[in-house]
Amino acid sequence: MSQPAKVLLLYAHPESQDSVANRVLLKPAIQHNNVTVHDLYARYPDFFIDTPYEQALLREHDVIVFQHPLYTYSCPALLKEWLDRVLSRGFASGPGGNQLVGKYWRSVITTGEPESAYRYDALNRYPMSDVLRPFELTAAMCRMHWMPPIIVYWARRQSPQTLASHAKAYGEWLANPVSAGGY
């Protein structure tokens, strides 16, 4: 039996203590030996990112999960800084930038609005696939495999049972993320 893929879960929430949904989603992740949970806001409260350390972490893992709330149609500020610093030219892209080739990228995102708000004729004017296009393009730039994102819409308003169901499915996927496909 082969070993499950090594997963680096980059967790970025500036107010983690207030996010019930993200805390529930993290519970199964910390129970898997193949998953490294890396809380960026806990590690870098000053936003000074240790780029060589972060790049070494990326090299050691097969699947990179970016778990965060959707902030202004993007990610929280520290994760954006992390993307700009760590996925640098010569490491992740450009000449010699082949360190992430063939690895997997998966976004796990919580939103404050229902799925129906993400349509051309709705509040946010664009479907979630369009909103997440910059992340998909970043994965392509790094020559990583883009996996369908996991979205928990209207996270604050989900029942404990619904959140538990998402967490269970997420945990099952994390146990064997490459062969399990989407959840």
Curated annotation (Swiss-Prot):
Cellular component, GO annotation: plasma membrane
Catalytic activity: a quinone + NADH + H(+) = a quinol + NAD(+); a quinone + NADPH + H(+) = a quinol + NADP(+)
Subcellular location field: Cell inner membrane
Primary location: membrane
GO MF annotation: an example: FMN binding
Keyword GTP-binding attributed: no
SUBUNIT field: Interacts with KefB.
PANTHER family associated with the record: GLUTATHIONE-REGULATED POTASSIUM-EFFLUX SYSTEM ANCILLARY PROTEIN KEFG
Protein task: Regulatory subunit of a potassium efflux system that confers protection against electrophiles. Required for full activity of KefB.
Entry protein name: Glutathione-regulated potassium-efflux system ancillary protein KefG
Lineage: Bacteria, Pseudomonadati, Pseudomonadota, Gammaproteobacteria, Enterobacterales
